[in-house]
UniProtKB/Swiss-Prot annotation:
Gene3D superfamilies: HUPs, Pantoate-beta-alanine ligase, C-terminal domain
Note: The reaction proceeds by a bi uni uni bi ping pong mechanism.
Location (main, coarse): cytoplasm
Disulfide bonding pattern of the chain: none
Binding annotation for ATP: 30-37, 147-150, 176, 184-187
Function per UniProt: Catalyzes the condensation of pantoate with beta-alanine in an ATP-dependent reaction via a pantoyl-adenylate intermediate.
Protein name according to UniProt: Pantothenate synthetase
Stated family: Belongs to the pantothenate synthetase family.
């Protein structure tokens, strides 16, 4: 595995690889890798001749009161996970390398961002789309892999890749969970022991809602209220949102049918956790 820290070298490597006909699987991350990321890397390894992993904590996608400065970082750990999962190139640029001057252009996302995390985190998805536009231009991937834990992010990325005719295939990968159901996340390290137990109720609330839908409930308000009430009863966390939308358009639905997403965000003392399920309802 080769570690690359400059844009120029990474672009030279990937342009030569593509010119020689090699397929490139790209996994963009902010580091502090866990089994969810490893799953993305393994899928990229299965489907491509070359695997590129980026580790970059992108300041553009953090708001003024968010956890940019304390976001967990451990490049030695990330290198080990990368090697264990067959990464060929680890792209590890500094902030100064990625943003050497003040940005004169950003990618403004006008759809799919006014709900869920986009509503709570203004500017977040513009930051995500901007850094991905840069990373796609740097790594020139054949396929790019994203976890469905950030399902809104996946919907936004699919939209902007289509809108800008970016020649990359977006590959969504199912949420990876701990044995007890908690969605794997780099931010889980912020949970206290008691909060870690309470956090299990996030996925349980979604499973209960899924059972109600499968039993025939089609009123979205009843489903979302069920989720909110369950979380508020079983945790000390604050429900940021518990919403149901059509997916991937993220538009309101009057009836639970077609492909839908039921998504939640819950604030604990030192961390905000998200989770979701997507269903196709007939």
């Amino acid at each position: 595995m080769k570690i690359v820290t400059t844009v120029q070298e990474m672009q030279q490597i990937t342009s030569e690889l593509r010119a020689s006909g090699k397929s490139i699987g790209f996994v963009p991350t902010m580091g502090y890798l866990h089994e969810g990321h490893a799953t993305l890397l393994r899928k990229a390894r299965e489907e491509n001749e070359i695997v590129v992993l980026s580790v970059f904590v992108n300041p553009l996608q953090f708001g003024p009161n968010e956890d940019l400065d304390r976001y967990p970082r451990d490049i030695d750990r990330d290198e080990n996970v990368a090697k264990e999962n067959g990464v060929d190139y680890l792209f590890y640029p500094s902030v100064e390398e990625m943003y050497p001057a003040e940005q004169t252009t950003t990618v403004e996302v006008v759809k799919r961002t006014d709900v869920l995390c986009g509503q709570q985190r203004p500017g977040h998805f513009a930051g995500v789309a901007t850094v991905l536009m840069k990373l796609f231009n740097i790594t020139v991937p054949t396929r790019a892999y994203f976890g469905m834990k950030d399902a809104q992010q996946v919907a936004v990325i699919e939209g902007f890749v289509t809108d800008f005719n970016i020649p990359v295939t977006i590959v969504p990968v199912d949420i990876v969970r701990e044995e007890d159901g908690l969605a794997k996340s780099s931010r889980n390290v912020y949970l206290s022991q008691d909060e870690r137990e309470e956090a299990l109720h996030l996925y349980r609330s979604l499973c209960i809602a899924k059972e109600r839908i499968e039993a025939g409930e089609r009123n979205p308000e009843i489903i979302t209220n069920l989720v909110k009430d369950y979380i508020e009863t079983h945790t000390k966390g604050t429900v940021d949102y518990a919403d149901l939308y059509a997916y991937p358009s993220l538009t309101m639905v009057e009836k639970v049918e077609g492909r839908i997403i039921l998504a939640i965000a819950v604030k604990f003392e030192n961390v905000r956790l998200i989770d979701n399920i997507t269903l196709t309802v007939k």
